[in-house]
Each structure stands twice: as structure tokens, then as C-alpha cells.
């Protein structure tokens, strides 16, 4: 297969109700193949859309048809927007601060269209951009059912950034950021460790991160697990105790050697599920210790999960384990730790997504932030609508995320023709610096078919063919001509006084701010920008943050810069002491019930020379 610049490949059901893609040239492996995730259908259409005059080539080499459904409670998109009750205790990663780098390393792993797990992009002691992916051996072999592991690796798809942009999980994320095909580096059944090398380096627009690792036997306490349960959006678990080492993984089938695993006795926040296998156990230093092999944890039942141990991989002297060690630590097994790195960190800038919509950081539903206005109200009689950003001069733009509301689309008015919209990028001039067509046909039809699962909101990622540089003024408007939006499709937005963004409307050649009587509107259109080293140094984060993880629990997280213990004090507004404690870790679970009914309380944290107080309201029930 070969795809010219601008060409896209789609795979969809005969009725267009389920869609995979579009896949571009960046998704093709070195061997010229694209492996796709499974799609539930008995008839399938493979379509290539290419610019006029180009010459794409396509050969269908193999189709795998399963006669039994996948052993998954959810596949991509199903159950989206109403997370299974089995997952209510494991939060969406966007809800939790401090995970910016780590979450970019964790991917969905799809094996030959049949098996699904999680994996982690990992760094090496020599640096470089080699795309090593750490997962579990039982993931690559689909529970050791298929031992032709080289073929399994070649048919592997790694999907990046599959995470909801909203805490409420109402927006289905883009699924096109994938890399297909890999080569086996080391596959070790006794430990369950598996390292593969992707056939292509993830492009910069994917914002990949290669996480550090540790082969130390007893790394420090306070652990994180990032995972894709049931192949759903990325979630996070926390454990504040100490893991058990050299335990025997308890499974129905005795796959692994005894005394090879870490045991997490019970998560303080979270649970795992099918699809979480291979996901990383991460220590306080943000290094991978191993990957999930098996578990018994549930939200309703606190029980153990088991992770293969890189420390035990380092101690084995088999060919497979030595290949893993040699790849991650070319100088030999004497090196036991490696820091994480951004593979594009040596460039002038790194890709970073920014947004004006605060609901991305809230546990409230989008409707709770202010009901979505109709397309007619938002668009009015304007020629175009856009979201205005004022950034640093000469900032580089790599792409944009647009969140669309498809709840008002009527299938009988859609027709059979292709449906598209246009994204325009203004950098200060009267004319757009770039005009990019965006095909929505498959996305809209796929969303409509899944409306029973509340998939009415959809994230669309638009990758720019070439980076766009802002002018000396640093002005940016991401815009959509109103006539290009399909009937019934609107742009997700936030409307209330004090919203962080600024919607603009264009009439003729003039842009003016759009406001309501109650305040401003922010269109949910997020640029992907180059974040320079200076920008990263200038960004500051609060000393701590609070996140409600359940009706009974609150997660208090300290900033990464805190390297010592911190002191916590909680007081009523009149100064009465409610609770004090020493915080030995960056993540601490507080019992929300001790605060209910107290009204306004002051939560105060001191760490070294820094201190911060936050007021919070806990009304009586």
C-alpha cells in the first residue's frame, strides 16, 4: 500500500454505521501495510480518498472474520459516554493533574483485530528515538493462544491519545492517531514481559512520550497505573502503600513462573479490567516497574492485581530477557534506572494542546456547564465563527482539535453524499493562512448509529500538512465557515460569565467578539502548538490540587516539584481544626465524609517554603 500526501483510508460497515479511520501515510508500516482494530460487521467497505491526480495503491492481503464476539465488555465507542458501572471508581486521566507526560506514553494495543490490551512507550539509557513498546507477553499472544509472535507483532496496532477530553466522558475522542506493525525484541512467558519495536516512530503531532523505567527490586512507594480497561478511554489508579515483591501471580491458568510478580494488594483509587493487561505500574519517580499480568480488583471489591517485574526480568538469563535488557540498557544489566524523555525534545519546540474550555478539567457534565445552544443561535447570520487565541509571537501550529455536537443531526436529512466541513486558520490577516477540508461523512454516520450510547459529541483531530507559524502579534483564530457545517452539526462550546475563551464571528472581512447577556462564549476548538523550553519553564502549577474521585473520596495531589513531606491542615471558616496530617506522598486520599455538612472549609498545605490555602464548600445533605 502507498498513500500520497492528503490521501485517507477508511474501513466501515456496509451501512456506514461504524467507521475506522481515516488513516494516512503516517499509519503505514515499513512493510507497506496497515493493520486496523476490529470492527463489528458481516460486510465491510474499504475506501481510499485521494487528491485529484494522485495515484494511491491498495492490495487487500488478508481479512480475519471472527465467528464469536471478542471477549470484551466494550469495544471502541460502545458504552462511551456512560462508563460501565464496573469502572466508576477509576477516573478519566483528564480529571487528574500531574499526568501530562506519563499519559502520553500509554497506548491501546490491538493484536490482529482479536486481542486488546495496554502498553507503554519506554526510553533507553542511550536516548534516541527508537519506538520501544512494553506490554505483557499474554497480550501479544492473546493469552498464549497464538505463539507465532512475529506475525502477531506485525499485525499489532498502537493507538495513541485515546482519552476523553472531558471528565464526564461525554466526548468520544479521535481514533486516528495510530501506528501499525511491530517487531518482537523480547517475549518471555515465564515473567510475562514483552518488548516490541514499532515499525514507525510516532509523528510529533501524536505528542508521544517515552517513559522511564526501573529494574530496582524495591522502588519507593506511592504507585500509579494508567490503563485502557475494556479498550475504553485512558483511566488512572492510585495506591499509596508498598507493593509486595516476588509474589506468585494467581490466575486460573498457571501461565507464569512462581515468585516473579509485584502485587498491589488493593487500589486506594481505581480498578483494572480486561484491556488493562500490559499497562504500567509506575513508581513515585514516574518510572515503569512492570506491566499488568492479572488481577482480581473491582470497584465493589478491593482485591489484588499482579504486575510483571522488570527487576525479575533483569535477573533472568534467558535469551528473551537478555534481549529486553540489551535494548533498554545497551551498556548492560548493571544500569537499573532510566529517566523518561520526549523523543522530540531536542527540537525547538514540543507539541502541546491548549484549550479555553474549563469543562475539560471538571467532573460536571457538559450540560451542567451550560446547555448547548442550537446551531442557529451560535452561527446566526455570520459568514464564519471561530475561537480567538493570543499566543507568543512565531508560535508553531501543528493541528487542531474540534469538538462537534451532532445531537441535532437527522438521518433522513443527511443524504448519501459525502459530508464535510472546512477549517480555516487566521494568523492576523484578512485571508486565512490555511484552509483545510475535513471529511465528516463516516464520523457523523458512525456517531448517529451509536446514539443509544450517548455518542452525540465527537472529537475531530485535524493535522496540518505543514506547521503554520504565527506572526509577530501571536494572534490566532481557528474558524469554520458557517456554510461548511453540515445541517444539524454545531460546535461544542461553553457559555457562562468568565469563560476562558473568546468566540469570534466574521461578517465580510471583519472579526468581532460574540457575547451573550450572561457573559462570553468559548468554542471548543483547541490548537496543537509548539511549546518551547522557555514556555515550559515559565508555566507554573499550584502547590496542590483537589479532585473528587467518588462520593466518599477526595484525591489531594502535590505538585511534582515537591520533593519532601508536606503538612496538611483542614479548618472551618471560623478557624476550628478539623483534620491535620503529614503527607508523605504526592497523592493522598481524604475521606470526604468527615467534611460533609461543615459548609466552607479551608484546606491548607505547607511544603518547605511554599504554602497554599484553598476554600471548598461541603454543604449539609
Residue ranges and their predicted role:
Residues 398-399, 535-570, 587-596:
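Glycine-centered coil/turn sites that cap beta-strands in beta-rich domains
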Residues 269-270, 278, 410-501:
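Aromatic- and Gly/Pro-enriched, solvent-exposed loop/edge beta-strand patches characteristic
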Residues 126, 131, 284-287, 570-578, ...:
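Short, glycine-anchored, charge-dense loop/turn motifs used at functional sites
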Residues 35-54, 468-480:
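Noncatalytic modules at the cell exterior or secretory-pathway interfaces
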Residues 338-429, 481-531:
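Beta-sheet-rich sandwich/jelly-roll-like modules and their strand-loop junctions
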Residues 39-265:
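Serine endopeptidase catalytic core focused on the charge-relay Asp
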Residues 119, 556, 596-621:
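C-terminal tail/sorting-segment detector
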Residues 120-130, 270-292:
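Catalytic nucleophile loop of clan PA
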Amino acid at each position: 500500500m502507498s498513500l500520497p500526501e492528503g490521501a485517507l483510508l477508511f474501513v466501515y460497515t456496509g451501512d456506514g454505521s461504524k467507521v475506522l479511520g481515516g488513516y494516512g501515510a503516517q499509519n503505514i508500516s515499513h512493510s507497506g501495510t496497515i493493520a486496523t482494530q476490529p470492527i463489528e460487521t458481516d460486510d465491510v467497505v474499504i475506501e481510499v480518498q485521494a487528491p485529484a491526480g494522485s495515484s494511491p495503491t491498495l492490495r487487500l492481503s488478508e481479512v480475519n472474520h471472527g465467528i464469536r464476539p471478542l471477549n470484551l465488555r466494550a469495544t471502541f465507542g460502545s458504552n462511551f459516554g456512560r462508563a460501565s458501572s464496573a469502572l466508576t471508581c477509576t477516573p478519566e486521566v483528564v480529571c487528574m493533574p500531574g499526568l501530562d507526560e506519563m499519559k502520553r506514553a500509554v497506548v491501546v494495543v490491538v493484536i490482529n483485530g482479536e486481542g486488546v490490551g495496554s502498553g507503554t512507550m519506554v526510553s533507553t539509557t542511550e536516548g534516541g528515538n527508537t519506538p520501544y513498546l512494553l506490554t505483557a507477553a499474554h497480550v501479544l499472544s492473546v493469552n498464549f493462544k497464538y505463539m507465532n509472535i512475529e506475525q502477531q507483532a506485525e499485525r499489532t496496532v498502537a493507538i495513541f491519545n485515546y482519552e476523553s477530553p472531558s471528565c464526564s466522558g461525554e466526548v468520544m475522542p479521535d481514533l486516528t492517531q495510530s501506528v501499525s506493525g511491530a517487531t518482537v525484541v523480547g517475549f518471555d512467558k515465564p515473567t510475562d514481559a514483552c518488548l516490541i519495536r514499532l515499525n514507525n516512530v510516532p509523528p510529533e503531532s501524536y505528542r508521544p512520550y517515552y517513559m522511564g523505567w526501573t529494574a530496582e527490586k524495591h522502588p519507593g512507594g506511592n504507585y500509579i497505573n494508567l490503563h485502557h480497561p475494556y479498550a475504553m478511554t485512558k483511566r488512572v489508579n492510585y495506591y499509596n502503600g508498598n507493593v509486595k515483591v516476588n509474589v506468585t501471580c494467581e490466575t486460573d491458568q498457571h501461565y507464569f513462573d512462581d515468585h516473579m510478580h509485584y502485587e498491589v494488594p488493593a487500589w486506594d483509587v481505581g480498578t483494572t479490567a480486561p484491556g488493562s493487561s500490559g499497562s504500567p505500574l509506575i513508581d513515585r519517580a514516574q518510572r515503569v516497574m512492570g506491566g499488568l499480568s492479572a488481577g482480581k480488583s473491582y470497584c465493589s471489591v478491593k482485591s489484588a492485581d499482579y504486575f510483571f517485574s522488570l527487576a525479575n526480568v533483569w535477573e533472568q538469563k534467558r535469551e528473551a530477557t537478555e534481549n529486553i535488557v540489551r535494548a533498554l540498557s545497551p551498556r548492560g544489566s548493571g544500569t537499573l534506572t532510566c529517566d523518561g524523555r520526549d523523543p522530540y525534545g531536542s527540537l525547538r519546540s514540543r507539541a502541546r494542546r491548549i484549550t479555553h474550555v474549563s469543562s475539560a478539567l471538571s467532573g460536571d457534565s457538559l450540560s451542567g456547564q451550560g446547555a448547548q445552544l442550537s446551531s442557529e443561535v451560535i452561527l446566526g447570520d455570520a459568514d464564519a465563527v471561530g475561537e480567538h487565541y493570543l499566543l507568543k509571537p512565531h508560535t508553531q501550529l501543528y493541528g487542531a482539535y474540534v469538538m462537534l455536537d451532532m445531537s441535532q443531526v437527522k438521518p433522513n436529512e443527511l443524504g448519501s453524499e459525502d459530508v464535510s466541513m472546512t477549517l480555516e486558520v487566521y494568523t492576523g490577516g484578512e485571508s486565512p493562512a490555511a484552509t483545510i477540508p475535513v471529511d465528516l461523512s463516516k464520523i457523523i454516520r458512525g456517531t448517529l448509529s451509536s446514539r443509544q450510547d450517548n455518542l452525540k459529541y465527537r472529537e475531530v483531530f485535524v493535522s496540518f500538512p505543514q506547521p503554520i507559524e504565527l506572526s509577530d502579534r501571536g494572534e490566532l483564530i481557528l474558524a469554520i465557515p458557517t456554510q461548511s457545517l453540515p445541517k444539524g452539526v454545531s460546535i461544542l462550546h461553553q457559555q457562562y460569565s468568565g469563560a476562558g475563551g473568546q468566540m469570534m464571528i466574521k461578517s465580510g472581512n471583519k472579526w468581532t467578539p460574540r457575547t451573550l447577556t450572561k457573559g462570553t462564549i468559548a468554542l471548543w476548538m483547541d490548537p496543537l502548538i509548539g511549546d518551547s523550553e522557555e514556555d515550559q519553564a515559565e508555566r507554573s502549577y499550584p502547590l496542590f490540587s483537589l479532585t473528587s474521585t467518588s462520593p466518599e473520596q477526595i484525591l489531594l495531589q502535590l505538585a511534582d516539584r515537591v520533593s519532601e513531606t508536606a503538612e496538611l491542615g483542614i479548618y472551618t471558616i471560623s478557624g476550628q481544626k478539623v483534620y491535620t496530617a503529614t503527607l508523605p506522598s504526592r497523592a493522598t486520599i481524604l475521606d470526604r465524609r468527615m467534611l460533609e455538612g461543615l459548609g466552607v472549609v479551608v484546606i491548607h498545605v505547607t511544603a518547605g517554603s511554599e504554602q497554599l490555602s484553598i476554600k471548598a464548600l461541603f454543604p449539609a445533605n
